[in-house]
């Protein structure tokens, strides 16, 4: 089945990016997730930000549209701005915090890091990219396998 995801990239005044630590996996992600039926990508990004962080946000611009070679999935990434709410633990994320772009945790999937870099590098027009990185779960499993071998 084909799925569509939507993520939001939020920078604070110091240029740090907001990441959320997932409850189900030991990963830091950008706020975002799957779109609901009848929902626009912008609406999904705003909803996911609220559900995962407790923050109210507005969309500023489209960063990129990403396909995945091994999955029937399309992902939208936007930058946004916080207009209200406050960071809270949620059902989906046990912690959200801002990180300097050069200090993003090692357990952040490469595809999320790539989207952050795209937000910084391609400020005038969106990027359209096929992301070849492993899925978050596959990537985490590969890290665990490497750890078991050492």
Please give the residue ranges for each predicted region:
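Conserved N-terminal beta-strand and adjoining loop/helix that marks the start
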Residues: 1-17
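Short, well-ordered beta-strand micro-motif
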Residues: 10, 77-81, 97
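Conserved Nudix-box catalytic region and its N-terminal flanking loop in Nudix hydrolases
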Residues: 12-51, 150
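Short helix-loop capping/hinge motifs at secondary-structure junctions, enriched
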Residues: 16-17, 85-88
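Nudix hydrolase/Nudix homology domain
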Residues: 26-27, 92-150
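Structural detector for helix-capping/boundary residues
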Residues: 33, 47, 60, 99-102
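Hydrophobic pocket-lining residues within nucleotide cofactor-binding pockets
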Residues: 35, 66, 82, 93, ...
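Active-site segment of metal-dependent pyrophosphate-handling enzymes
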Residues: 54-86
